Amino acid sequence: MYKFEIYQDKAGEYRFRFKASNGETMFSSEGYKAKASAIHAIESIKRNSAGADTVDLTTMTA
């Protein structure tokens, strides 16, 4: 089961990580001063990621 985990870092900021069903962390967030802000970011990702495009910047030329 994939899941978001919210936690507090050593500085007291709230962060989240997205974990795969095998327990591997797929990505983690920046720090947020308020827990509500971290929750809002998670909800935004859930709402907006399904239709997101993948842009490969390694193939672009200047």
From Swiss-Prot:
Pfam families: DUF1508. Gene3D superfamilies: YegP-like. Belongs to the UPF0339 family. This is UPF0339 protein Atu0232. It comes from Agrobacterium fabrum (strain C58 / ATCC 33970).
